[in-house]
């Protein structure tokens, strides 16, 4: 894979925020993490102003309470294994034992046994993470960044659009090959403490506005699990870019999506540049001018 274009000139201390311009009409692109962090700090001064002034906000999916309930109900419907299959039979015995131990008191084994591996990987295995020092920057009781953005937009009467529908989002998850889902569950259960430490590293990097650990994690995913990266990132980036083309030329759009969607030669930053948009990383005022590409086309 080519070096991540979006960070080719990245310096420490810049938020994951880009200006997106079309002949003087400016919008903003913001890379999030789906975790409860300080939104104002993550956005920086220009990001806060851009969100407050936006004509329309785009999130990966609609995060309104009604949409969240719809998502949960549809996810649960898709999460049930066929009657002749069981999670117990799909996992290695050691993984099943670790999983049932971790979920004791939260989820009965007979219910757990009926769940698809992809659903367990995304919603259940975090229970296996052993207690430890709280991850610095995580704010228990706070909404994830993208949901905070949605709440703020709704409070100011700013229309919100999903980059994809709830159905599209669920299909990305539920169409994960069974083998891939099993591998994700077993990998997460193999060393939960290491997963906690890795999360702490990424959260710390995001808060410190240090791209390097984030880019490293992105590169590892792209190299080690190319099929997952294709389905989870690249195909969605392409679809989202086509959707955004209908709006960005009007200016004052605020687009927030997971940070990994910004990076690489198939990330949103590069895709928009290839379509003629001027895309510049927002730098602190004291920083030297950006050296990003300024030509269209």
Which residues are covered by each model-predicted region?
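Compositionally biased, proline/threonine/alanine/serine-rich low-complexity intrinsically disordered stretches
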Residues: 1-11, 171, 179, 204, ...
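Structured, acidic catalytic/metal-binding patches in enzyme active sites
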Residues: 6-9, 14-232
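C-terminal soluble interaction/assembly domains
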Residues: 230-297
